[in-house]
Amino acid sequence: MGHKYDVYGMGNALVDMEFEVTPEQLASLGIDKGVMTLVEEARENELIAQLAQQRGKQSSGGSAANTLVSLAQLGGTGFYACKVGKDEAGAFYLQDLNDCGLDTNPHHETAGEGITGKCLVFVTPDADRTMNAFLGISGSLSVTEMDWSALKQSQYLYLEGYLVTSPSAKAACIEAKAIAEQSGVKTCLSLSDPNMAKFFQDGLKEMLGSGVDLLFANEAEALEMAGTSDLNQAIAYCKSIAKNFALTRGGAGSLIFDGENLLTIGTPKVQPIDTVGAGDMYAGGFLYGLTHGMDYEKAGQLASETAAKVVTCYGPRLDTEILQEILQSVQAV
């Protein structure tokens, strides 16, 4: 049967605010470098005030949203299940999804029920990405926001690992995965962040259940989940929980397991300035490839090229024209 959507994604809806800082500033502000940390609203407002002079651009973020936006820019179709508040940031966020060609669940939240989440993104000169997120109303994402008919009309269900921090969102992920499996929709999960694998491992294992069709992880996340410092053991662990996986390794490229063979995908040599969104972009390129007739190797090449490009500029997204050029160059080989 024909599918209405290539991917049905579930994730946090956060407006990103980017700041260029030094590692010393992060230390003086008491911010853990290189990971995502959840903070309360008061703490977030305090940081915004202290760093007002270094504030960069504001954009719609959320890991799975970034993935679906890149999928749509490449020419794919997506539905994004999320939750925003009835405020300026929420309106900005929904308009952005709409402008990108993505469908989303209706938002009928009344004023006063909660505010749209924000993520402070700190970029250091070494191109590392550090995040402090206040989830706001996104933290109460639940089965209420799900559109099961849209899910059943999709090729893939994409779950964002960050949702593990919210009991209601985690429960929605588990239910969505069960419905996907009953409906012949392939399931995939992104581990999202080393801190998720470290502090919410039991919850991630609940979300994984009996396993997924496709797992996205970076090396640090895979090692943390496997409880090892040995890459081969981490690979064996990934094989035990996913039929296929893509394991990203930064400048060393990525490893893709297609169900039979472990493929090594190189990555273009670039000078990274901001690694925010690299994993999201990789997943978007990979899922576009798989849903548009590419084999795992070709999809991996597209994913690597798009991720390598996004780290050379600030922010988690690329212009559509740039992504289309990359797609054409990969298809031409």
Swiss-Prot record:
It comes from the Bacteria. Signal peptide: none annotated. Transmembrane segments: none annotated. It is an enzyme of class 2 (transferase). CDD domains: adenosine_kinase (cd01168). The keyword Membrane does not apply. One of its GO terms (molecular function) is kinase activity. InterPro entries: Carb_kinase_PfkB-like, Carboh/pur_kinase_PfkB_CS, PfkB_dom, Ribokinase-like. Its EC number is 2.7.1.-. Pfam families: PfkB (PF00294). Keywords: Kinase, Transferase. Belongs to the carbohydrate kinase PfkB family. This is Uncharacterized sugar kinase slr0537. It comes from Synechocystis sp. (strain ATCC 27184 / PCC 6803 / Kazusa). The lineage of its organism: Bacteria, Bacillati, Cyanobacteriota, Cyanophyceae, Synechococcales.
